[in-house]
C-alpha cells in the first residue's frame, strides 16, 4: 500500500531492501496501537507471523523473480545468526531489555512514569524489539533485530550508490556507509538507540538526492516525510 506512494511500479525491484526498512518502521505503530489494548506477547508474534506467511503464499507468483535477492538475504542472516547465541551483551541487557520485557507483559499504563521514572519510554523502537523478543535466546533478540535493520540500511544505501546518476550522491552515500560501519559496528553499545540516528543520516542523504539527482521529486519528498515520523 505504501510502496505505491514512494516508488514507480517498474522500479520497485531496485528498492527491495528499502521496502524492508519501511516494514520495520511500520511495525512500530502497529505494535504501539496493539499495546494500548494488549501486551506484545508471543501471541502477537505468532499472529503477525502467520499473516506474513499467508501474504507470501498468496503473492508467491510475484516472488519467483526475487529469488536472487531472497537468497542473498538468507545467506546474510544465516552468517550472522550465531550472534544471537554467542554475543555477550552489556548494560543494554539491564537498560533496554527490561523495558522490552515490560512491553511483553503489560499493555500501556498511562502515568506509570510518575511512579518510577525508569519506566518511561523515550524510544519507540523498544516496541519493535518487543515484537521479536521471543523463542530461544529471546534476550539476545534485542541485538538480532537491530542487526537485521543495520544490514538492510547498508544494503539500501548501496542500492542508492549503484542506481544514482549523481557523483555527489554517490560520494555522500559512500561516506555514509563507512560512517555507519565504523560508528555502529558494536551494536551492543546502542541497543534501541541507533535506529533513529541512522534514519536521520539517511534522510539527510534523501534531501541531497532531491537537489542533485534526477529521480522523481515527489517520491523523494514522500520518503522524507515518512521517515521523519520514525526519528
Regions from the PLM with identified roles:
Residues 1-64:
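Membrane-embedded, hydrophobic transmembrane alpha-helices
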Residues 30-35, 184, 220-231:
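Membrane-interface alpha helices of multi-pass inner-membrane proteins
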Residues 32-40, 86-89, 183-192:
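Membrane-interface helix caps and helix-loop-helix hairpins in membrane proteins
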Residues 55-56, 67-91, 179-181:
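Transmembrane signal-anchor helices characteristic of membrane glycosylation enzymes that use polyprenol
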Residues 80-169, 187-189:
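Active-site lumenal/periplasmic loops and adjacent helix-entry segments of GT-C-fold
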Residues 145-149, 173-175, 182-209:
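Multi-pass, polyprenyl lipid-linked donor-dependent membrane glycosyltransferases
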Residues 163-165, 203-221:
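Membrane-interface transmembrane helices that cradle and orient dolichyl/undecaprenyl
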Amino acid at each position: 500500500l505504501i510502496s505505491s506512494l514512494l516508488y514507480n511500479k517498474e522500479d520497485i525491484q531496485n528498492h527491495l531492501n528499502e521496502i524492508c526498512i519501511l516494514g520495520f518502521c511500520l511495525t512500530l505503530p502497529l505494535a504501539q496501537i496493539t499495546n494500548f489494548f494488549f501486551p506484545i506477547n508471543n501471541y502477537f508474534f505468532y499472529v503477525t507471523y502467520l499473516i506474513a506467511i499467508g501474504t507470501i503464499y498468496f503473492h508467491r507468483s510475484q516472488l519467483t523473480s526475487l529469488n536472487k535477492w531472497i537468497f542473498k538475504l538468507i545467506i546474510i542472516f544465516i552468517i550472522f545468526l550465531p550472534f544471537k547465541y554467542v554475543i555477550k551483551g552489556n548494560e543494554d541487557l539491564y537498560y533496554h531489555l527490561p523495558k522490552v520485557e515490560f512491553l511483553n507483559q503489560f499493555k500501556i499504563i498511562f502515568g506509570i512514569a510518575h511512579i518510577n521514572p525508569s519506566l518511561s519510554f523515550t524510544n519507540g523502537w523498544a516496541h519493535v524489539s518487543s515484537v521479536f523478543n521471543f523463542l530461544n535466546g529471546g534476550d539476545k533478540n534485542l541485538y538480532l533485530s537491530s542487526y537485521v535493520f543495520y544490514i538492510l540500511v547498508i544494503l539500501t544505501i548501496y542500492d542508492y550508490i549503484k542506481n544514482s546518476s549523481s557523483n555527489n550522491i554517490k560520494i555522500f552515500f559512500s561516506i555514509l556507509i563507512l560512517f555507519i560501519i565504523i560508528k555502529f559496528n558494536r551494536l551492543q553499545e546502542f541497543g534501541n538507540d541507533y535506529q533513529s540516528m541512522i534514519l536521520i543520516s539517511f534522510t539527510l542523504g534523501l534531501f541531497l538526492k532531491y537537489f542533485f539527482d534526477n529521480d522523481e521529486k515527489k517520491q523523494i519528498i514522500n520518503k522524507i516525510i515518512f521517515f521523519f515520523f520514525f526519528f
